[in-house]
């Protein structure tokens, strides 16, 4: 069964095959073409189709729509962009300049009748009507970062951000446009999936606005016999992404949980995003050369190490890098040993030696050289990334922040008073201290004002900008007036208990001990088998019950149709039903598949928690799937900046 990302890839490959229904052509049969995209189209393509794959699909040149371009005759030009006025004006300019002989226009969102008429008039005026071969609405206006993780915007994502949704001076028409943008992308998502969902969401929230607009859009399309996009042939639709049962779309508002986006994480992918600003599966790490030029590292689905370890705790990743390096060195030494034992020195000698049956082992080893070289490239890349993360961990004491925040969120007693930690000049950066304080403020039930005042004074002495606290205070007061919401968002931590350990890490091919860093290994509510060595403690991870973040707890309740005061009050919208309504049916079967979407921005912490949760729920008889998405993807620094912007709109300077 195809995943969301695979279905989007297939849709774009079909577009690049000039919207032909035939199977994907080989490079030898591909029609050579030019790909012209706007920035949104570029953001959609870049995480899922590499430049090498574009070449194999016959794309000889890929350029920005608004860049300076020369005329290229006799080659199809495939446009992939939003039907905005700015983009359409540029396409009309291309018509007038006669840049191409063959035009294939593919719009990310449906183009309105008036705009298509204006485009046709421009083509008629330019005398190129016959040159326009196809005009398509593609319904792929979302960004697939993983098989089960998507966002709606990358560049200019502030248009759909938490700040944009919650700022005080947003006009009604601006909010309508923002919600329509989210709805259009979610509609495109379900067209790509080939399924019509049941919609659940909390009432009186931005999520409800999205839910009602989306239900209306789905219902209108379903009951339009001519334009129905969900009546595809089963063989074409691939039976839809999910099982025969309809999926549930759980729309949630970022306001339900402000602590998790600020949490110092310990899993590899979330750490890369938090510390190194991972974006569209690409991260830039400063090279160790004399120039120290940032080097791009592509973390895609073809990277076996990344696919295996992106959700692992960082110390586990470090040990895995060391093991991969040792495996590579053993393979390299084996080839050298075989060559030496047979008296082979150069590549030319290998060709002569292949006639001998005794060289079968050497032949196999030599044939594996390309795979070994790729393995070495990935080892070097992940060593570079891990070293950059390690430097941040040491400088900012991120391991200690992770452990302290886990204890706060799971209501455990801290080893040291928070005030002492905030006053420690060596304890992280001002931003880290502010994140820790906000998590403490959110998770604590009742806090004396004198204690808060002392904590705020410590933050100010550390150089923290306290603007965000005014907004967090207002947010918490609203949450406290909504008992059902407050109950649903009780924190239990990100699913970990921790045990200190020392471990080896690698840097440029050599291992070293993380001096001064207290490494943490995930402990799943069971005893960890410890074996004392001469200089470190080794720990074995044992999977067991996983504590869940608020989004995961709510997802579990909705999928299993558990009776709960808070989720029972959620809207229940079924676009396929002839009579619309929002009343919860009496008889409901548990959902096997869910799309969880966070209005106001998602993060890798919640994504990984959902991934871990669904792994725990899999059995031989039950196969459940969850797709997680957000209007944007923000790390803690970006989210803190949004909170500060909202706090700046409030007169009260600090939280109390």
Swiss-Prot record:
Main subcellular localisation: cytoplasm
Superkingdom of this protein's organism: Eukaryota
One Gene Ontology cellular component: cytoplasm
Gene3D superfamilies per record: 1.25.40.60, 3.40.50.1910, 3.40.50.2060, Syntaxin Binding Protein 1, Chain A, domain 2
InterPro entries for this protein: Sec-1-like_dom1 (IPR043154), Sec-1-like_dom3a (IPR043127), Sec1-like (IPR001619), Sec1-like_dom2 (IPR027482), Sec1-like_sf (IPR036045)
Purpose: Non-vital for development.
Family under the similarity heading: Belongs to the STXBP/unc-18/SEC1 family.
Protein name as catalogued: Protein sly1 homolog
